[in-house]
Design a protein with these regions (language model features):
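C-terminal amphipathic alpha-helix
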Residues: 1-39, 66-130
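Surface-exposed short loop/turn segments
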Residues: 58-61, 65
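Amphipathic, heptad-repeat alpha-helical segments
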Residues: 39, 45-57
Length: 130
């Protein structure tokens, strides 16, 4: 999970750095990284969800549930950036459509401008005790 969080944080940083770039290959590469994270985390989530390696009533079964919730929270945060990239790539010059492609990001912000999905992910990660 920690490796995915690092990759997600890097993807968010790449979005912040590259979203206004007119280099389509750069923006496409950033979008592709989001797609790769999405695919890999879904695979790992499904493997965990379908695993029978945890005994009923054990503390590990509870942690399995916490890990599953962490994968879901990570995906929810990733989806904000992934969706924004998808809209961003519709524009040759992203400055022309900034209001449109920033919609997913703005929809995720609380009154202070902070990401609600990021806050939820951090809360969920704090619940994991391995």
């Amino acid at each position: 999970m920690n490796a995915y969080v690092v990759r997600l944080n890097n993807a968010v940083a790449a979005f912040n750095n590259d979203c206004m770039s007119t280099s389509r290959p750069l923006r496409q590469s950033d979008y592709n990284e989001c797609a790769a994270i999405d695919s890999q985390t879904l695979t790992d989530f499904l493997l965990l969800r379908n695993s029978n390696a945890f005994a009923d009533g054990s503390r590990w079964l509870e942690q399995k549930g916490n890990l599953q919730r962490a994968y879901i929270a990570l995906d929810q945060y990733l989806t904000v950036i992934y969706d924004a990239w998808g809209l961003n790539l519709e524009y040759e010059n992203p400055a022309e459509g900034v209001d449109r492609w920033m919609e997913p990001v703005r929809a995720d912000q609380d009154a202070s401008g902070n990401s609600m999905a990021a806050a939820h992910l951090n809360e969920t990660l704090a619940s994991i005790s391995l």
